[in-house]
From Swiss-Prot:
The keyword Secreted applies. It catalyses: a 1,2-diacyl-sn-glycero-3-phosphocholine + H2O = a 1-acyl-sn-glycero-3-phosphocholine + a fatty acid + H(+). Expressed by the venom gland. This is Phospholipase A2 neuwieditoxin-2. Its main location: secreted. It comes from Bothrops pauloensis. It comes from the Eukaryota. Snake venom phospholipase A2 (PLA2) that shows presynaptic neurotoxicity. 10 ug/ml of this protein produce complete neuromuscular blockade up to 70 minutes, without inhibiting the responses to acetylcholine (ACh), but with a partial inhibition (67%) of the response to potassium chloride (KCl). It holds the Pfam family Phospholip_A2_1. Dimer. Keywords: Calcium, Disulfide bond, Hydrolase, Lipid degradation, Lipid metabolism, Metal-binding, Neurotoxin, Presynaptic neurotoxin, Secreted, Toxin.
Amino acid sequence: SLFEFAKMILEETKRLPFPYYGAYGCYCGWGGQGQPKDAT
């Protein structure tokens, strides 16, 4: 579930998943546009 995925991110990175990773990656976020953050 999404809850379990968020819990895994928190446990592995020690960061809250949504403020740090909510709009992460290529073309993520509202409207599906934006610049890639890194090679991930």
